[in-house]
Amino acid sequence: DVIDVIEQEATRDLYAAGAVQAGDDDDYFSSNLFTVARRRVVWLAVLVLASFFTSEVIAANEDVLQQVVLLAAFIPLLGGTGGNVGAQSSTVVIRGLSTQSISSLGPLRAIGREAMAGALLGVLMMLLVVPFAWWRGESALVGLSVGMSLLAITTLAATAGAAFPLLFDRMGLDPALMSTPFITTCTDVAGTLIYLKTAGWLLVHLPQLVQATGISTHFFAFGVF
């Protein structure tokens, strides 16, 4: 009946959001273990392959990490934060699509709104993260790298989290297929690249900027934030 159909569709959407392939039956916990594994392995294999790019990004920027080893300590923090922001944005947008509440705003304005929200979240989290990174890394370079990257990552993650479901919907595909694990993996790769490239740029140019302004590195970094 109608209630069963609604329940089945809701179950499929929830499974898709968690990167789990839905089966014909709704009773997931009574399914055979091999069936359970088969439903999960496809998306997990895709995500593992995508995660290889993160390893390649780190390997390609090994020289930066060798110069400032403590930069590596903040890679999980930045990747996790970006993934969480992207997951929040995608959840809000997918819900808006399912209830039609996003239609009054329009796709471009919805993406722009989420991008601004991501930037604001980045600024707020910088207030918490940058002092800790500066203290823990014992270097203004680490604080600057983490702070600048955090702002860029949260903005990018929120934009991607909103844009991908809208793109899928425009293509006639189920927006729920743009699952949280997929967005998290993508933002992890992009975030690691942004972070290490930012740190690499600062390693080269920060001494020049400090010399040009004639102030200490710590005062320069404090002025930036």
Give residue spans per PLM region.
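Juxtamembrane boundary at the C-terminal end of a transmembrane helix
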Residues: 196-214
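Juxtamembrane helix-loop transition segments at the membrane interface in multi-pass membrane proteins
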Residues: 8-21, 60-69, 85-110, 161-183, ...
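Alpha-helical transmembrane segments and their lipid-water interface positions
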Residues: 11, 87-90, 121, 125, ...
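Intrinsically disordered, low-complexity linker/propeptide segments enriched in Ser/Thr/Gly/Pro
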Residues: 210-225
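Alpha-helical transmembrane segments in multi-pass membrane proteins
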Residues: 43-51, 74-78, 82, 117, ...
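Cytosolic regulatory modules rich in charged/polar residues
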Residues: 1-73
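Soluble-to-membrane junctions at the N-terminal ends of transmembrane alpha-helices
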Residues: 27-46, 104-123, 143-147
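Membrane-water interface of transmembrane alpha-helices in multipass transporters/channels
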Residues: 60-75, 137-148, 178, 209-214
